[in-house]
Amino acid sequence: MISVREATVDDVDAVREIGLTTWPVAYDGLVSPEFIADGLAQWWSPEVVERGITRGITLVAVVDERVVGMVGLGQEAGFWVMWKLYVLPGYQGQGVGKALLDGAIGALPVGTDQLLLDVLVGNEQAIRFYRKNGFGAPRSTPDRDLGDELIWMARAL
C-alpha cells in the first residue's frame, strides 16, 4: 500500500537517495554526464533538499515503511510549480507517481487554478505520464525563458 505524507527534515537522506538514484537513470542519453553530475550537486545536496522540505511543499511516498518517491513544489512569480517528482526505479509503474501527484495537488492552497512543471524536451516517459494525468500547454507561465531544453506543462485545477 502506498501512503503519501509531508516530508520532514528526518527524510533528507531518503529524499536525496531518490534523487541520486533516479537522476542518472531518468536523464541518461538526454543530457551530458556532466549535466547530470552538476544537477545532482546543485539540486540534491543535503542543504537544498532540507530547504525544499522546510520552505516549500515536499511530500514523500512510503511503501512498506520505505520512502520510495518524492514530489517538491514551490512558487515562482506567483505560480505554483512542481519542480521535482521522482520515484525509485523498482517502484515505477505501480501508482506511486500518481499518488504523489494527487497528494501534491491536494496540498496546494485553496484557489490555486493551475499547477505548472517544466520537463526536459525528449523525456518522453515523463511527458506521457504528465499528459495522462491532465497536463498540457499552460495558459500562462512565469516570465522565465526555459531555453530549448525545457518546456512548460500545466494542469488546470
Describe the residue ranges of each PLM region.
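Extreme N-terminal starter segment of soluble prokaryotic enzymes
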Residues: 2-3
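Acetyl-CoA-dependent GNAT
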Residues: 6-12, 16-90, 101-108, 138-143, ...
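Non-catalytic, surface-exposed connector residues within folded enzymatic/regulatory domains
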Residues: 30, 94-95, 147
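Conserved glycine-rich acetyl-CoA-binding loop
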Residues: 66, 84-102, 120-128, 132-133
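C-terminal "cap" of GNAT-fold acetyltransferases
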Residues: 79, 113-157
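Short coil/turn segments at alpha/beta junctions that flank glycine-rich nucleotide-binding fingerprints
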Residues: 94, 110-113
